[in-house]
Amino acid sequence: MMEIANVSSPEVFVLLGFSTRPSLETVLFIVVLSFYMVSILGNGIIILVSHTDVHLHTPMYFFLANLPFLDMSFTTSIVPQLLANLWGPQKTISYGGCVVQFYISHWLGATECVLLATMSYDRYAAICRPLHYTVIMHPQLCLGLALASWLGGLTTSMVGSTLTMLLPLCGNNCIDHFFCEMPLIMQLACVDTSLNEMEMYLASFVFVVLPLGLILVSYGHIARAVLKIRSAEGRRKAFNTCSSHVAVVSLFYGSIIFMYLQPAKSTSHEQGKFIALFYTVVTPALNPLIYTLRNTEVKSALRHMVLENCCGSAGKLAQI
């Protein structure tokens, strides 16, 4: 008769993180905190500008307002726990906290994959079908695409995370990372995880490979349309319209490909932690800078908002 293992769920997980390099923890704390503050401030400004400036009430900026909210939520699901572990001697996270962390991070990561593909379709419609753009990207479609992105990400997170949470865990409760990821939780299971792995590969295909394919096809059509534009000014405007999105897609998918789609032996586990640190902390902070520095409309709206607030405050002081 087969012996039944002790499969009680642990009350806490130990996040080893960067504990093997204690000399780096203080430096990493300062760096991570700085990037986190920049991320919250920058993404918050993008959301505020997108909602307050009527000139930005277009399909492109409707989707753009979703992206910074995603970035803020994603980094907030991971960074506070990371900062606590870097600062103090405790390197633990509760079982419930770990579950919430991988539910939310999986949900928001999948949502961003679909949203970036949706934004590429919006750019395709704007450049390749300019005369029909307002008809194609009508408000109902934009709302439907945004909802599909959020609900699609939520669905795959609910399925994958629930399957992971149902795994009987036994033995070691140490996670050699700085946040809870489903593949690492699966490694702690004492049963066969083939079903979980199959679901993870299927979700990766649907939410990573297919959106990336749509992005590449969209930009293939866009590149062909831009090359047909005769005037240099027209080509420059078309390039500026897409450059911010291309930069964000390159950062996001570049990190994913470098992290997950390489042969296992080509990247050490320690290198993997720093790559994960890049896409969870650095990328969300860079995205608003990319959109403000490379987008004249956002810069103009931001300048207008600052001047309006400054002039309004000066006027009120003068009346007093």
Swiss-Prot record:
Extracellular side: 1-26, 81-101, 160-196, 261-273
GO biological process, one term: detection of chemical stimulus involved in sensory perception of smell
Subcellular location: Cell membrane
Ranges per topology, Cytoplasmic: 51-58, 122-140, 221-237, 294-320
InterPro entries: GPCR_Rhodpsn, GPCR_Rhodpsn_7TM, Olfact_rcpt
Keywords: Cell membrane, Disulfide bond, G-protein coupled receptor, Glycoprotein, Membrane, Olfaction, Receptor, Sensory transduction, Transducer, Transmembrane, Transmembrane helix
Recorded topology in the membrane: Multi-pass membrane protein
Pfam families the record matches: 7tm_4
Disulfide bond entries: 98-190
Positions of transmembrane segments: 27-50, 59-80, 102-121, 141-159, 197-220, 238-260, 274-293
SUPFAM superfamilies membership: Family A G protein-coupled receptor-like (SSF81321)
Domain of life of the source: Eukaryota
Glycosylation site residues: 6
Annotated Gene Ontology cellular component terms: plasma membrane
An example Gene Ontology molecular-function term: G protein-coupled receptor activity
Keyword Ribonucleoprotein belongs to the record: no
Role, per record: Odorant receptor.
Family: Belongs to the G-protein coupled receptor 1 family.
Name by which UniProt lists this protein: Olfactory receptor 2C3
Chain's gene name: OR2C3
